[in-house]
Amino acid sequence: MLISAPTSYGKTFIMREILYLNQEKYKNILLVFPTVALLRENALNMEELNQDKKMGYNVIKSIDREIDCQDRNIFVLTPERAMQLLAQYPNIEIDFFFYDEMYKIDEDYCNDETDDNDEKKNSYTERTFLDEARAKTFRICLYLLSKRVKDYYLAGPNLKREKFGKGMQRYIAENNIQVKEIEFEPTKRIMVKAYNKVIDEDYTNLPYLEKPGIVKIHSKVNDRICDVVNYIEQKGYGATILYCTTPAKANEYATKLAKNHQVNVVKNERFSEFIEHLKRNYNIDGSINEWSFVNVLEMGFGMHHGKMPKYIQKEILDLFNEGIFNLLFCTSTIVEGVNTNAKNMVVLNHSKGTKELTVFDFKNIIGRAGRYYHNFVGRYFLVDKELEKFEHTEDLTLNFVTYDDQELDPVDIDNSEYMDLSDINKNLKHKREEQFKEYLLTNDIYEKNRLIKREYQEMLLRFLLNNNILYNKFYRYLSYPDILMQFTTYHAMNTVLDIFEESGLLDSIIVRRYKAVSNTYCNEGFHGLLRYEIDNARGDKVKHKSIDKAYMDAFKTQKDIIEHKIPKILALFETIFSYASLLRRKTLDNFSLSKVSRFYETGVKSYIGEQLIEFGFPVDAIKRIEDNNLRLLSMDASASQKYILEHLEDIKQLLDSYERGLLDKALKSICS
């Protein structure tokens, strides 16, 4: 079943109803969400449903521990984690899956690579195996799940069957999928023109209501923003999100509005503690005084974008939804499925990063004004004249290229069954399979990292078989009992990166950068990355670099390199090194880099630390707990939870007041 319904209609509510009604039928359930923010929100909802209705499932959000596939499990994962589940447990029987925001299988819809990015990518990063378009992950994950699971529910907003491309039509037909198009809008949305000399609300379809009078506004964009905000407040229209194309624009608009528009800052203890926490944890030699994010918060506005640490993003959303502040500047990350209490959406720009918005992006953004069962009327203000064209632009064609006639990428071809391909792609697949007969790499090894081209995996395998020096250098690290320490203290990551450079998978510029970032992070944590960027800005090593840009670059480095690309390198390396060792007849005793990958992904070393990260707890606070309670590093789930509860008062002494309050909430969730 595929359900297309307006934004905030309640598509996940339908999913929960399906699960409740079929709890006797479904044992292993997989719920796939596009972002970690949505994953966390829905995992919490599933935990509450599971507990309230006594459904008897384990709710699992990551694949970092041994899983009993014979038990009753609800997996709440991103597409990347879902692929990891299929790779680690190839024989798992999934009885039902839900796939949210399924339109992201199409590159025209899924331009995630431009989200929150205000500068063009360096050309060399486009050439590595680490930079595949995210739509490919969505597409291959959905393709594989559709092949192995009978019952599933696909969801997306504003999808029209008449706009399905040939490939999408074939996918629907081949899999006997019922399509339900719901056009009923539970929330009435009023378009407001604010790009000329006046604010003009469109009441064309509301003849029974008195239209507000036209209000004059200024021509300069920052003055116009101030006029629109004043208008919303004077009319009592409620909470407002202001969409900006990049974090830099969000900083600029929010800072200038704060100077010209006074708001009554709500006195709230948690809000005050949160600001003090930020000042204490993100200050490098007074840099906090120049960081617009904190300055804007103190003036009573919120700011949200995808480069921020996850717990900060979550706190900002919670404070906004609780009414601590009524104005929230954001980029595209907040409007892609995350629910808020916003009644108004002010759209300030017609682009998304360096690319222009699509009509689909536009509909998704304005769909965040008002929410089903919360606000029955929402308003969207168009401050940029270029936005009006989206009111009259036709929807994009949604395609599933695997089933289409166009020539496919090698990764798509290798992950598709022969009979699903067009004639041209069947020929390409046949040629590739003939080529693979000369390969040492087997299918089962390839499929553990099936989003990485087979050619690259073969290159790495042959290098590890032929280069004794680097193979043996890494092999010696395995003679020590603590593999994580070999990476965090003795720079085993440098050896891995040398192997990727010498094998031709990464060039020297990237390797030098990744080594520096990894070594700094292992020695000094995020503060080391931030200090490097702050020093660059203050020393004028990078021309015209602001302190705001320094914070942004540090967050981006952590998210892009530390949390994403290094774990991807490690996953491939673990698989190929293990197979090369088998061919070399070298003994490996329980070799696994999963603990190392989790360290880079999360920044913590203990099981309880990983649970706290999943809840949304500050990494630096967890490190303080771990450093002062080293026994936690060797404890399993139940032992670490018991230890924390027994030593809770001592542990709280290591935390600030904001962190203490957050810890209490986290433990209620983790230990329930």
Listing of model-derived features with the role each one plays in the protein:
Residues 146-152, 351-399:
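Conserved segment of the helicase C-terminal RecA-like domain
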Residues 2, 6-9, 13-20, 24-74, ...:
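Conserved C-terminal RecA-like helicase domain
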Residues 66-67, 143, 149-257, 302:
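Conserved interdomain linker/interface between the two RecA-like ATPase lobes of SF2 helicase motors
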Residues 389-441:
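Long, hydrophobic alpha-helical segments
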Residues 93-98, 327-351, 363, 378-383:
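A short beta-strand element within the Helicase C-terminal
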Residues 31-32, 75-78, 98, 150-157, ...:
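Structural recognition of the conserved hydrophobic beta-strand(s) that form the central parallel beta-sheet
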Residues 423-672:
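C-terminal accessory/interaction regions of large nucleic acid-associated machines
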Residues 89-151:
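SF2 helicase catalytic motif II
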